[in-house]
Amino acid sequence: MVPAPHTQHYSSSTMPNSSSTTAHSAPTTNGDVHAPKDHQLSSPSDTVPAPVNRKKQKRRQKQAARLAERQLANGHVSTDDATQNGSSHTNPERHHSDDGGADGPDHEQPANGDVYPKDGQDSTEAHIDSQNPQGPNGTESSQKSTGRKSKKKKGKKGRNGSHAQGDETSTPMSTPSVSMSHPLPPPLSSHLASHNILKPAKNRSIWNTSTQEERENIKTFWLELGEEERRQLVKVEKDAVLKKMKEQQRHSCSCTVCGRKRTAIEEELEVLYDAYYEELEQYANHNQGSFEKGSPMVPPPRLYQPPLRSPGQHTRTQGQFHPSRGRIHELTEDDDLEENYDEEEDDGDEPYSDEELDEEDEETRAARADFFAFGNSLTVKVADDLLKNDGKHFIDMMEQLAERRMQREEDTQYGIAAAHESLHSGHNHGPFDDEDYDDEEDEDYDSQEEEDYEEDEMDAMTEEQRMEEGRRMFQIFAARMFEQRVLTAYREKVAEQRQQKLIEELMEEETRNEQRNAKKAREAQKRKDKKRLQKQAKEEERARREAEKAAEEAAAKAEQEKKLEEQRKKREEQRKKKEAERKAQEEERARKEAEKLRRQREERERQAEAERKQREEKKRREEARRKEKEERELREKKAKEERDRKAQEQQAKKDTAKGGEEAKDQEKRDDQAKRSSQQVPVPIPTNLHHLQGLSPTVAHSPHVPSATPVLPKAPTPAKPRQPSQQDSHSSSPHSQAPSTDPSQASLSPRSMPVSQSSGVASGNSQQGQGLHAMLHQPQPSTPLSPLGRSIPPGFSSVNGIPPNPPGLSGMVARPPVGHDLPSYPSHSGPFISPFRGYPAPTGIPAPPGINGARPMPPGRGFPLEPAQGFAFHGQQIPGAFSTPQGGLPHRHSRQPSGSLERSPLENHAQPMPISRPSPIKRPSSTQQDQQKGDDRTTQRDVDDLSAHLGSSALLDDSDVSLSSNLSQSLPGATVPGTFSGPARASFGGPSLFPDPLSASGWSNNAFGSGGHHRAHTSRPVAIRLLVIQACKQLNTMSPSKGADGYHDVNLVLRHVEQLRPQNEPSISLKEMLDICDTEGNTQNGGGTFSIRKDETGEFVKFEPDNNSAASGHRGSIVPGEIGSPVPSSSLPAFGGIGTPSVLRQYSSPPMGF
């Protein structure tokens, strides 16, 4: 390993603190300052600071240094001199602490593993440390404090302790020799040597090596190099230095002085470099054997020889070149150097003032920044540091050597003590970089120059000392550069090893990663395989479950289908069973219908037989009546003759008794005859009952009755028949039984007596008798003639209501606005009703014939329209008091009424047995005899007319006399009801239209008035309407059986028969089917019939259309529905089938009066 001999020489010759340190300072070894013993004994003010003049203090130091040099020259070596000349202070404790505490608090291992010594290390450590000059970034590994003063004090305290310890333990190892024989460095301690050298290489790590290990490795590396390799390293350094110097000189001055400097520098450099290499060879050859044996390294003797001048000369020389070193310090531009060397300042500055301490610190930093940079960081190259700024550091050092050399020449020639001053004053070259200087350094330089001027007289440097000084400086620089190259080569080798090792480790790491990844991949594959197996097992399990589920579903489906099939079979059986039951029911129903039809046929046969017997009986009765009539005519003839005789007798008597009154009576009779001749002939009576007690003497004559001849009555056949305003049913005398009560008389006006000459007494008695008869008088059913009926004489008006206009005596005037209210009682008579429909206050109706009115039926609470069979009549107004009336004509004995309310013509009718009329009696002058005779005459006339006139004349002897025909639509009586149609033949209550024959234009109905309609309905239309109604009823009653709308024709026919009025002929199946084939229109109910034939029979279905009266029949009431009257033969005047309700909307156009 290359030794660092320059460390000792540099420490003793080039340290700036050798001339400017405190009293305690002495030559240093790698930063260790040792105070001489004599100075320590003579300086009791070590720790006591005292204000001392700075210049005086420096003189004392220089004087002490000169004394020490003299002692060295005389051969007396003190402890301090031995330390200065290379003797080492051995401190076992310190070696031990350095060895074992490489990583302790005083040592910080940098990135590359090198540890550098700090203050207090001995010369051996300094020697070893010189081979590892630089650390990373050129920084010291000690921790830095933040304050400048604290760093100084800390370093001074540490150095004081090390000085004391070194002084106590140091021993001089050898004496100096002028003949270049240098003392050897002290041997290393046994534990240090064994730890550093004999450590196995395999146990050493190339990554983390301690300072001692690295130093040993560097030594080993240098010793292993060959001659050529070593020369090549030196050659490279020499070429580099020369190249840099030449490049620098191109920019320098070209004057003679500068040229001499360049020449001197080149020559000096070549000589010194060659000499230094020779010394290195000598050292290497000398140290080869001892190194292998573990002996300590011995530096070359030449490098360790003491200086040839006194301490004073050394200090003076250093002071002369201090400004250049200051410039080098500025050019380093390394702030870490200042910080790292703050702690290595001398501790002798404490007794002095702060100004002196600052100046000395600046000097110390300047000196150490120049040549001690290699000891702080191994990564900063010394050559790069010195050659920075185009090698100004090295060039300045060479210039210093050249200046010294020139100074020596001038001193020998002129003997000038202050040669350096004249040199600088004569040659005024500025520095290479003026801005490198600062004010503080200028002050230091000025203070140094002043001190040097004061000491010029005392300092005298021999030429040999100056040569030695320059040689030593170059050796230090060359050694640094060389060591740096060796260190660089070593680092390259270590870097290569480390790179190789790193590659190997990376390969191993990669291999391990690959193995790890392969292992992970295998494990992942295993997990995947496991998951796949699990998934496969799950899939198999799911497939098995699905198969089981499918099998269960299939079984359940089969079971369900089986159940459905059973249910279907069961439903089919039930359907067949129901069908069989339905067929059985249909058969039973058909059987019942056939039985019913049979019974109906038998019933009709029985009825036909009974009618036949009745006709036979009728013929017998007619024959007997004819015979009786003949006999009666004979008796009447005889009686008439008798009456005529008696009348003539009475007349003769009257003529004699009353001569003057005969003309008046005759005139009255003529007026009465004239009035009777103006009336229409009396209609055929429908009831032969006569009113009891009524006689021509109802209106009593005020004259006394006398015997007057009776006028002959008009013959009965002369009475004309009503043309079309009376129904055959109401005009037939055979439907009513003749009355045998002698008290009942005809209402005909011809029954009125001609003579009215009864007395007052007899009038009073007859009045009471007539009143009794009126109380028991039945309502006559025979319609009275509308003409010829007027108020009798003396009854011009009733209650202020005017009489009828002339010629219309039968038309009773309507009441005024309050016509619906009963009139107030009239004072015209005790029993006379004020007018038609208004009963008297006593409840006794007026006699028939007066005003042409009919009394109000008892119990009626609302006014009724007049019977439709009467053309001229007045409105009926309910009375407050109604008295039951009896004796109304009875109805047909075979057909009872089915109406909602009895007709006013049939109220309180009592059936009476048919009997023969009373026998003909002789005419008498009494009322009863006259009445009886009139009854017989009227009966004969009616029977004769009944046999030859009306509908009876159209019938054959074998036919049954029916009440009406379907093709006829004759007006009939209005049945009390809720509604009334426009036609007088329709069924209902008060009409919306007034009576066109009435005297007033008012109607009982408040909705309006209008003309009348004449209903006209044919039998096919009526049958079709009944079939439509039957189909609708069947759809309503049995929607399930007739869901398709088809019904059995027999069933429909039965319903039609039920709806058919009883007075109409039966409808056959063929007739109904033929009528169903007709098209529907607005007259016959609309719609169409569909007939379907199959093996079970014929079925009919009604399909309505827009012409059909679907729901409401437009206000009409269909027979059989709620609110409709039950069809009956007692209402023959309604016009046949369907006239009361259905055909209201199909009535004929209105007819005028």
From Swiss-Prot:
InterPro entries per UniProt: Fungal_stress_NST1, NST1
Comp. bias regions, Polar residues: 76-90, 129-140, 312-321, 740-769
Keyword Cytoplasm: yes
Primary site of residence: cytoplasm
Compositionally biased spans, kind Acidic residues: 332-363, 433-462
Coiled-coil regions, chain positions: 447-658
Composition skew (Basic and acidic residues), residue ranges: 91-109, 116-128, 507-526, 536-674, 931-941
Record flagged with keyword Cytoplasm: yes
Subcellular localization(s) per the UniProt record: Cytoplasm
Low complexity: bias regions: 11-30, 64-73, 169-182, 721-739, 913-925
Keywords: Coiled coil, Cytoplasm, Stress response
Pfam families named in the record: NST1
Annotated Basic residues bias: 53-63, 146-160
GO CC terms: cytoplasm
Region (Disordered): 1-212, 288-364, 421-467, 507-941
Lineage: superkingdom: Eukaryota
Role description: May act as a negative regulator of salt tolerance.
Record family assignment: Belongs to the NST1 family.
Protein name per UniProt: Stress response protein nst1
Biological source species: Aspergillus fumigatus (strain ATCC MYA-4609 / CBS 101355 / FGSC A1100 / Af293) (Neosartorya fumigata)
Gene name tied to this protein: nst1
